[in-house]
UniProtKB/Swiss-Prot annotation:
The gene is ugtP. GO terms for biological process: enterobacterial common antigen biosynthetic process; glycolipid biosynthetic process; lipoteichoic acid biosynthetic process. Pfam families: Glycos_transf_1, MGDG_synth. InterPro entries: Diacylglyc_glucosyltr_N (IPR009695), Glyco_trans_1 (IPR001296), Glycosyltransf_28_UgtP (IPR050519), Pro_diacylglycrl_glcsylTrfase (IPR023589). The keyword ATP-binding does not apply. It comes from the Bacteria. Processive glucosyltransferase involved in the biosynthesis of both the bilayer- and non-bilayer-forming membrane glucolipids. Is able to successively transfer up to three glucosyl residues to diacylglycerol (DAG), thereby catalyzing the formation of beta-monoglucosyl-DAG (3-O-(beta-D-glucopyranosyl)-1,2-diacyl-sn-glycerol), beta-diglucosyl-DAG (3-O-(beta-D-glucopyranosyl-beta-(1->6)-D-glucopyranosyl)-1,2-diacyl-sn-glycerol) and beta-triglucosyl-DAG (3-O-(beta-D-glucopyranosyl-beta-(1->6)-D-glucopyranosyl-beta-(1->6)-D-glucopyranosyl)-1,2-diacyl-sn-glycerol). It catalyses: a 1,2-diacyl-3-O-(beta-D-glucopyranosyl)-sn-glycerol + UDP-alpha-D-glucose = a 1,2-diacyl-3-O-(beta-D-Glc-(1->6)-beta-D-Glc)-sn-glycerol + UDP + H(+); a 1,2-diacyl-3-O-(beta-D-Glc-(1->6)-beta-D-Glc)-sn-glycerol + UDP-alpha-D-glucose = a 1,2-diacyl-3-O-(beta-D-Glc-(1->6)-beta-D-Glc-(1->6)-beta-D-Glc)-sn-glycerol + UDP + H(+); a 1,2-diacyl-sn-glycerol + UDP-alpha-D-glucose = a 1,2-diacyl-3-O-(beta-D-glucopyranosyl)-sn-glycerol + UDP + H(+). It comes from Bacillus licheniformis (strain ATCC 14580 / DSM 13 / JCM 2505 / CCUG 7422 / NBRC 12200 / NCIMB 9375 / NCTC 10341 / NRRL NRS-1264 / Gibson 46). This is Processive diacylglycerol beta-glucosyltransferase. The lineage of its organism: Bacteria, Bacillati, Bacillota, Bacilli, Bacillales. GO terms for molecular function: 1,2-diacylglycerol 3-glucosyltransferase activity. It is found in: Cell membrane. Keywords: Carbohydrate metabolism, Cell membrane, Glycosyltransferase, Lipid biosynthesis, Lipid metabolism, Membrane, Transferase.
Length: 383
């Protein structure tokens, strides 16, 4: 593999997933020996104020703007096809031009739908091999552009959707979504139980409560579950210090039944010992769940890519989608009590995993970029 390539990875922090994939690809580049790799949060660098405002509105959409987000997501075909969303096509253009001139990239990798990149190529007449690493289990048309050389997708379902709208089969590769290597390493579970003071003889429910819009009644759910003899609850609060504080009284009363944690770097450890998990249906978290084989309960997914992700996993028997507040406790309790269903769901979610996605993607990107540039040189020689 030619590791002398200059690689530019573009991302945006609308949700953590796109940035996490960019970081994962960067780390894999380092592991493979690439020396000239740059990661750019393009919109943040291009216009910090606008970026901050739109990120805030994005986060608010999980609680107060769901219908607006639904209209945007499902109405994007009309916006995109009629090119009425012209401002989006130009966002970050100046910053992109600066990055291209400074780093002279041989390859551009997008982990967010950066239409500005293929539009820049089209306007400038530059041939910079450009690749989209898609971060969900569904297709959103805003990822698609004639000047994207290849798409790396999670499943055959996404590939089929791309082919339906005219993408050539050779321009799509099913690779899975890149996740941190730690999720694919072997670990001793006994050490994890000991580290977090958990019992291997009880069912463990993991609640990923730090993400926006996961679950609002965490305290109520914990109060109900800690009374059950054979269940332990682990709540990861992330940076949500208010939530962690609100659970401390329950934890003090039931120290062997409830664990409340802040930000956890090695979250894969908790995935490994969890019997099921309540989480947000983001593409990265769901891919991490497939790597470990932990069934997921998805509460009231936001219309758009999260809803589509949730339905994909539910249809394949890998997740339970709960849309009503009062159904959460019953869904959790019945699943944890049903060993057969738990094992079926573990098998189903594990079957969705594709390993070593980052390495597979980067290896193919290098190969494809060389094919593209060789074609360019051949055309020049003949003209």
């Amino acid at each position: 593999m030619n590791t002398n390539k200059n690689i530019l990875i573009l991302t945006a922090n609308y949700g953590n997933g796109h940035v996490q994939v960019a970081k994962t690809l960067y780390q894999e580049c380092e592991r493979l020996g690439f020396k000239n790799v740059t990661v750019s949060n393009l919109y943040q660098e291009s216009n910090p104020i606008v970026s901050e405002i739109t990120q805030y509105l994005y986060l608010k959409s999980f609680s107060i703007g769901k219908q607006f987000y639904r209209l945007f997501y499902y109405g994007v075909d009309k916006i995109y096809n009629k090119r009425k969303f012209n401002i989006y096509f130009k966002m970050g253009n100046k910053r992109l031009d600066q990055l291209v001139k400074k780093h002279q990239p041989d390859i551009i990798i997008n982990t967010f739908p950066m239409i500005v990149v293929p539009e820049y190529r089209r306007r400038m007449g530059k041939v910079i091999p450009t690749f989209n690493v898609m971060t969900d289990f569904c297709l959103h048309k805003i990822w698609v552009h004639e000047h994207i050389d290849k798409y790396y997708v999670a499943t055959d379902y996404v590939k089929e959707k791309l082919l339906e709208i005219g993408t050539h089969p050779s321009n799509v590769k099913i690779t899975g979504i890149p996740i941190r290597r730690q999720f694919e390493e072997e670990m001793d579970k006994d050490k994890i139980y000991e580290k977090y003071q958990l019992s291997p003889d009880k069912k463990i429910l993991l609640i990923m409560a730090g993400a926006h819009g996961v679950l609002k009644n965490v305290k109520e759910l914990c109060e109900s579950l800690v009374t059950k003899e054979d269940v332990q609850v682990v709540v990861v609060c992330g940076k949500n210090t208010m939530l962690k504080s609100s659970l401390e009284d329950i934890e003090a009363l039931y120290p062997n039944k409830l664990r409340t944690l802040g930000y956890i770097e090695r979250i894969d450890e908790l995935f490994r010992v969890a019997d099921c998990m309540i989480t947000k249906p983001g593409g990265i978290t769901l891919t991490e769940a497939t790597a470990i084989g932990v069934p997921v309960i998805l509460y009231k997914p936001v219309p758009g890519q999260e809803k589509e992700n949730a339905l994909f996993f539910e249809d394949r028997g890998a997740a339970i989608v709960v849309n009503r507040h009062e159904e959460i406790l019953e869904s959790v309790s019945s699943l944890l009590a049903d060993e057969k269903k738990l094992n079926e769901m573990k098998k189903n979610i594990k079957s969705l995993h594709l390993s070593n996605s980052s390495e597979v993607i980067l290896t193919d990107i290098i190969e494809q970029s060389e094919i593209i540039m060789n074609k360019k040189q051949t055309v020049r020689a003949l003209s």
